[in-house]
Amino acid sequence: MVSVESMIVGVSFRAFSCVLVLFQLIGFMNFPIKLHQTTGLTIGDHRWSTSIWWIIQLALTVICGIMAKRNYDNLFNGLLLTDAMNNYFKFGLGLLTVFVTLADSWFGIETHRSIWMRYRDLATRNGTFFGLIERPQLVRVLIRFFFVFLVIIAVCAIVERQFYYDIAYGSQWHYFWTYNLYPYTISHFRHVYHLLHILLMTANVRQLQKRLSRLQQLGVAQQLEACRVIYGQLWQINEAINELFGFSQALNIACSFAQIAFDLYWIYAMLMSQDTGLKCK
């Protein structure tokens, strides 16, 4: 009879496989990668069959910009200067964030692969499952990630539905929001993917810290030197993560703050228009 623990492990790995496929469809990963619950991490070389999804995302981003230009009157025309500038910055910065994210994913393919390959090499060298952590520890990390992932999706879906069908329905803001949904969604997925790398790195660093604490108590100098090599590997992984996500995440965070600021202004404008009896376009 299958135990509850084995069911949780199986569901966690299958769910994580689906998440990896999702990140490939979005264009973040341009190489095949799988994490099996028994064989561990499998990483393939860069291939065009995987990169086709990156090309599709790039095409969608270009089409999104072209359609916004063609429908300029419906998106921006007739608004007050402050409202129009808000929409310009919000849409333009969001679209730029997507372009930079896709550029980082393409030009940083080998950097990206090196992150996962170093985790695999650490596991092979130390007889562990993923980096320095064993399978039960990895399952706990994945469960924590899935919880955060589902909460973010649920909150965003509720907010978007409320806005789309209630708050701005029938207004010009409603039309603009539909165009801004694509870069807005890609921005959130980039945050989530970065969060995954942070959680995995944190789990490995904690495991290294535990090893160092045990070895310091025993006073084993030779094994301390081995841990120094492991620390070097984790440092290289961290540097690769910073290189892969650095510029795109800086722009992504700026885009998120701009989104919040402009949305707060929009709410203020809506409240003022309701108070004065004006119709919000």
What are these model-derived regions, one by one?
Residues M1-K281:
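Membrane-embedded alpha-helical segments and the immediately adjacent membrane-proximal loops
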